[in-house]
């Protein structure tokens, strides 16, 4: 793993700092003065690769290791496109076992067989969030089932792993953007807590939690209000823990202010929601909802319902292209983590984080390109311990764009300036129509990676770590530098 090496830039070395391999050597002088980015203690790296030739045409600190933040989602997305067609979909199936009596009583259980689909019940899918539950309830009625002597079992065994990444920061775990990844993900694995706030330095009042989560306890004795108008509240709590604690502060004088956290057990939440929906529809369900994990912890095992039971309902996700488009445009960590697990699930019945990362590296080795030297702890880039070089990222992007295995679609799945997480970045630039970038940011980190499709097509990577000053100022420095580099390259054609 590469360590940070903050550098001081001395004029005599600038000629070697950033080079353009096209045209006259003096052309580099047009770009060099824009470095360093982010202050004297920052580490800055850039790599621009001509996709057709595979040659590096501009580089600076390109072989230094950086924290990529959310640009790491590009590795996950590119890997999925190497594995599956853009129209590939995930499938969640519902089975029942036992016999149905003449009076409509099912002497058995319903089983939701999960596959880790992040779009199930998601507010970002094109269907209503409760559509899955309503369709299963309709399928139960259509099968003539009026009562269930057992209950609803959520089979979350496809991902028998710690739902959250051990290398994530503790202050992130429990918040919506660090939601765990389960064998069954539902409703984006999140809830919303709404408060009202009064005078600064007073204690907010909890108005409610949506959706209601049975057993969830919310403690916030140290949550206060502030004058700044900023949301500085963090929710703490791990997977399967039904106690959530909130620290920090919320803006003062708000009738309603909402913060979001992650569900403690999404598979159980879905099974409970379906149980409630069936009961409201007049279908009696005897047992309370449970999951494969809970049964296993009680010393019980699931029957072979897939072989001995009956398929009741089949739900398909949006296409891979649609899910990746959302993942990259909105920088959705849950989608990225769930899709990473699909890499191993394509070759094995279950998936773990470590196994999925290793399978991802195997896929790239077999494709003739190695990412073995990268330090990867997740699929979303949320871990601050991830490390990759701009050169490695750029070569990967160029490789997948030339692969003909769906990689040529990747630029179309990326946001352009003015969209998603690029809403304000280079939005008014004349280069904007040709830029397709994924941003990545965390404390002291600002990165961009993707494609520029101007007179020629390039893979573009910029990484800045340990910057000082405001994020807006660093983003402007990056925008100015990219404008100079890409304009120079365009003018060479």
Tell me the role of every PLM-derived stretch.
Residues 2-13:
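Bacterial N-terminal signal peptides that target proteins for export
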Residues 57-59, 131, 337-493:
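Small-residue-rich helix-loop
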Residues 61-66, 260, 380-383:
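A short glycine/serine-rich beta->alpha loop
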Residues 31-35, 82-371, 484-492:
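Conserved serine DD-peptidase/penicillin-binding transpeptidase domain
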Residues 11-21:
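Bacterial N-terminal signal peptides
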Residues 59-79:
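Short active-site loop at a secondary-structure junction
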Residues 26-65, 87-91, 134-144:
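Beta-lactamase-like hydrolase cores
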């Amino acid at each position: 793993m590469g360590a940070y090496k903050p550098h001081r830039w001395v004029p005599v070395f600038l000629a070697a700092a950033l080079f353009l391999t096209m045209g006259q050597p003096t052309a580099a002088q047009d770009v060099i003065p824009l470095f360093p980015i982010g202050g004297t203690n920052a580490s800055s790296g850039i790599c621009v690769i001509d996709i057709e030739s595979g040659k590096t045409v501009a580089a600076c600190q390109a072989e230094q290791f950086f924290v990529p933040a959310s640009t790491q989602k590009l590795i996950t997305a590119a890997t999925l496109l190497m594995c599956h067609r853009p129209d590939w979909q995930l499938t969640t199936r519902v089975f029942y076992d036992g016999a149905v009596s003449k009076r409509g009583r099912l002497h058995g259980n319903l089983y939701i067989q999960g596959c880790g689909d992040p779009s199930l019940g998601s507010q970002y899918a094109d269907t209503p969030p409760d559509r899955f539950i309503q369709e299963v309830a309709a399928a139960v009625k259509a099968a003539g089932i009026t009562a269930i002597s057992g209950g609803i079992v959520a089979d979350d065994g496809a991902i028998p792993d710690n739902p959250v990444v051990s290398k994530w920061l503790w202050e992130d775990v429990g918040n919506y953007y660090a939601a765990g990844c389960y064998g069954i993900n539902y409703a984006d694995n999140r809830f919303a807590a709404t408060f009202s706030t009064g005078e600064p330095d007073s204690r907010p009042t909890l108005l409610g939690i949506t959706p209601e989560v049975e057993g969830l306890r919310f403690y916030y004795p140290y949550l206060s209000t502030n004058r700044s108008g900023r949301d500085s509240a963090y929710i703490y709590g791990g997977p399967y823990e039904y106690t959530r604690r909130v620290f920090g502060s919320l803006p003062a004088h708000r009738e309603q202010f909402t913060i979001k956290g992650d569900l403690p057990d999404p598979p159980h939440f879905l099974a409970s929601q379906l149980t409630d929906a069936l009961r409201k529809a007049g279908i009696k369900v005897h047992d309370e909802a449970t999951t494969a994990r809970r049964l296993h912890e009680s010393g019980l095992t699931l029957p072979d319902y897939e072989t001995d039971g009956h398929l009741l309902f089949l739900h398909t996700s949006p296409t891979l292209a649609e899910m990746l488009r959302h993942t990259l445009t909105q920088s959705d960590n849950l989608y990225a983590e769930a899709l990473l697990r699909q890499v191993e699930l394509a070759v094995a019945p279950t998936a773990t984080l470590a196994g999925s990362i290793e399978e991802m590296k195997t896929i790239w080795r077999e494709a003739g390109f190695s990412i073995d030297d990268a330090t990867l702890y997740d699929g979303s880039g949320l871990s601050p311990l991830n490390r990759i070089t701009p050169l490695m990222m750029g070569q990967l992007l160029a490789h997948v764009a030339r692969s003909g295995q769906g990689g040529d679609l990747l630029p179309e799945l990326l946001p352009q300036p003015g969209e998603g997480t690029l809403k304000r970045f280079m939005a008014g630039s004349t280069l904007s129509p040709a830029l397709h970038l994924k941003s990545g940011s965390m404390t002291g980190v600002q990165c961009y990676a993707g494609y520029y499709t101007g007179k020629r097509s390039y893979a573009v990577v910029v990484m800045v770590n340990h910057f000082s000053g405001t994020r807006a100022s660093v983003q402007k420095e990056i925008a100015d530098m990219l404008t100079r580099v890409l304009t120079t390259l365009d003018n060479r054609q």
